[in-house]
């Protein structure tokens, strides 16, 4: 086996993991588990939440569960951060390995012309026995919206009744159906253009933490305020729910099984302990998300032991 990856270096990267480290982790995984599936994570910080979490190294916070075996093989020292990938590996055990290729602070529209390097890694390495989990698009609204997105979100948040959102009659919803269905389909199609995996799990984002639920400062406070979330959280929540129904549940990739997952069923905006900065999954939030995802992944693994 090749050299192990320096754990501090592996988690130091803000935007995803360094490609060299990912390549090393992938090689170690293949050497350790050549016949087992890899679960690739693609998208944004809803899956790449490591930056917001405490270290498990001395001076940090102790893990509440044993370190999954794959980290003992890949990291030196074997002290992973308890991010979404960690919890997936905890639940999956030796049956499959989760590998995080999602990128913090990345956008869906960034991928319109060219894939990110992390996406290209997935495209070039994913196999027929593997699975792909995608969660992307939230930063196009909350972090760096373009002018068109801002206009449609303001129309939806301030000039549209909740009842029209819930009925699907709100005209601004069409814009976001294009984003979360058509644009996500194009993105996923690029990821699987060389090899089609066993299945793709496409996620709709969770609800942000409600202002009334717990006091947390957030980089997204201004955006959440502009969207009316601090005053009427139910309105944005209704929009996310409807976008799941009209967009995520309708995603289709020719020749591929697509399973929609509503992360807001797990992170519902009511519990401060599930969040960091109101919009990032905490250790506990990531654990809950991983548990939800594994419930979908387990049947797809079939007889893998």
Which stretches of residues belong to each language-model region?
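Serine-esterase "nucleophile elbow" of acetyl-processing enzymes
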Residues: 2-102, 123-125, 151-155
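Short amphipathic alpha-helices and their capping/turn segments at secondary-structure boundaries
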Residues: 22-35, 111-132, 185-197
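A structural motif corresponding to the C-terminal end of an alpha-helix
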Residues: 84-97, 182-200, 239-262
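Oxyanion-hole/transition-state-stabilizing segment in secreted/luminal serine hydrolases
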Residues: 112-175, 207-216
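The substrate-binding groove and active-site-proximal loops of carbohydrate-active enzymes
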Residues: 167-179, 234-235, 280
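Short, well-ordered beta-to-alpha junction loops that form the rim of enzyme active sites
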Residues: 203-207, 262-265
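Substrate-gating cap/lid alpha-helix
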Residues: 210-261, 286
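Histidine-centered active-site loop/cap adjacent to the catalytic His
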Residues: 273-305
């Amino acid at each position: 086996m090749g050299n192990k990856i320096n754990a501090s270096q592996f988690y130091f990267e803000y935007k995803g993991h360094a490609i060299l480290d990912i390549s090393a982790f992938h090689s170690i995984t293949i050497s350790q588990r050549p016949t087992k599936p890899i679960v690739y994570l693609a998208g944004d910080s809803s899956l790449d939440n490591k930056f917001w979490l405490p270290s498990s190294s001395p001076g940090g916070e102790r893990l509440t569960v044993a370190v999954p075996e794959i980290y003992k093989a890949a990291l030196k020292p074997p002290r992973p951060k308890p991010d979404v990938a960690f919890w997936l590996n905890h639940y999956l055990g030796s049956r499959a390995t989760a590998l995080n290729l999602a990128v913090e602070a990345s956008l869906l529209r960034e991928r319109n012309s060219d894939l990110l390097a992390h996406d290209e890694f997935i495209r070039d390495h994913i196999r027929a026995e593997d699975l792909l989990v995608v969660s992307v698009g939230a930063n196009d609204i909350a972090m760096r919206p373009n002018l068109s997105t801002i206009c449609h979100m303001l129309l939806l948040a301030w000039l549209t009744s909740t009842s029209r959102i819930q009925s699907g009659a709100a005209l601004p919803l069409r814009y976001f159906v294009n984003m979360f269905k058509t644009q996500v389909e194009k993105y996923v199609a690029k990821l699987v253009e060389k090899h089609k995996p066993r299945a793709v799990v496409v996620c709709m984002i969770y609800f942000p933490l409600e202002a009334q639920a717990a006091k947390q400062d957030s980089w997204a406070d201004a955006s959440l305020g502009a969207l009316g979330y601090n005053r009427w959280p139910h309105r944005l929540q209704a929009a996310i729910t409807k976008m799941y129904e009209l967009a995520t549940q309708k995603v289709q990739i020719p020749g591929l099984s697509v399973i929609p997952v509503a992360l807001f069923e797990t992170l519902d905006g009511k519990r401060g302990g599930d969040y960091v900065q109101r919009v990032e999954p905490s250790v506990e939030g990531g654990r809950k998300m991983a548990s939800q995802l594994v419930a979908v992944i387990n049947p797809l693994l079939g007889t893998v032991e």
